[in-house]
Amino acid sequence: MSGVDMLHGPLLLKILWFSLPLAASSLLEQLFNSVDIAVVGHFVGSNALAAVGSNAPVIGLLINLFMGISMGANAVISTLIGQRDHTRIRHAVSTVAVVALVSGFALTVLGTSLARPILSAMSTPPEVLDMAILYLRIYFLGMPFFMIYVFGAAILRSKGDTRRPLYILFVAGIANTLLNLLFVLVFHMGVEGVAISTSIANALSAFLMVRLLRREEVPFRLDFHNLHVDRRELLRMLKIGVPAGLQGMVFSVSNVVVQSQINTFGADAVAGSSAALNFEYYCYFIIQAFNGAAISFIAQNYGAGLMQRVRRVFWICMIASVIFCGMMNGIFACFSPFFLRIFSSSEAIIPYGVTRMHLVLAFQWIACSYEISASALRGMGRSLLPALLTVVGTCLLRMVWVFAVCPVWPGFHRLMLVYPLSWVLTGVMVVAAYVRFMKKAGDAPLAVR
């Protein structure tokens, strides 16, 4: 099955053809997660909902480094496709497979061993702490399978194939939902049932991804008899992926700090914020889809030396992400009470969820500015600068806000203001960095190796 030709012809329809299945994959995954949370909220209780929801920033903190490396793998293989270097593509695919396995087992060890200390340090409400720890430990037992799917999808997306990862995710998501209903409604399990169903679904997605890659054409075929780590390709992946991953980790640290402050408002605030966060994920996945398009399209065209196409890709991804994300932001924010009641019948959580959706979700489209700009720079092999700027503009500001502003200007609604403020600051800095780099590059790529 061929992917999208990123080097020739009109770009808009090809970017949409690439991005929409990618967005559908993430949205579908979040939809299944939302079903899990809705089942927990309605049939187990608001404390269980808070236990599952409070783990979101912790999971992000632990997996973001490796997700960044998968982004580096995508960029490296895409660049090699642009350079038509099939030998190095084959070495890169083998390297990605090994990195996926190592990453998965490392995450299992980290997640299971650090669950209690991290959640305790976050001031997780005592009534939900044990449930949150149990959920997190079971969830991370499935990390090796999750990483196999993530890195396998990165290989396919580097050549423009975003449809088959969607099909795999659909099958695994259906299995996840059915198992979740079975464990919670039939076997009367709590958060552990949701976590077990997720791990089983991850195992299914890993099996399907490996089966697919084993049947790919050379140089993208996964060959178990020739698995090895190519030092050159690994270093290139790490050069792009580690700064992006560290950015994501620091980003998650700032979210953990904000979550810790949310926890001080009580279980209802945690549950309401967690319910609202689901809709932020839906909108963010739209941005992520165009991020993926920007990295793959720009990396291939940069590798081929087509700088004018690089510029066109950037603007198409930027404008499209703002339009699609902004539309979803508006729909969710305007009908926030209705959407929040999908996740819980408790009226006590609604005011907190509405506040978050009006002050955070409604302005999420601003984040497109730095997300697309950073992805464009990473597609051209420049990952450190956008990572540093994002750390300063987003993460540092959020921590200063929590520790310096909130004590003298308390309130849940004032805490939420830190999100749009940090997006504006980071957007200005990262867009400026992209413009400066492109002026320096002119019409010739800089140091493509």
Where are these regions (language model features)?
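Short alpha-helical transmembrane segments in multi-pass integral membrane proteins
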Residues: M1-S19, I77-G142, A175, V186-V242, ...
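Small-residue hotspots at the loop-to-helix junctions and early N-terminal turns
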Residues: S46-P57, A132, L136, A195, ...
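Alpha-helical transmembrane segments of multipass membrane proteins
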Residues: S34-I37, V109, P117, F151-I155, ...
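Small-residue-rich hydrophobic transmembrane alpha-helices
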Residues: L49-V109, F146-P165, Q259, G272-S336, ...
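Residue-level signal for short hydrophobic patches within transmembrane helices
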Residues: H8, L12-L31, V35, V58-L65, ...
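Transmembrane helical elements of multi-pass membrane transporters/channels
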Residues: W17-D36, I138, A172, A201-S205, ...
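Short runs within selected transmembrane alpha-helices of multi-pass transporters and secretion channels
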Residues: S70, Y139-R157, I168-N176, V194-M209, ...
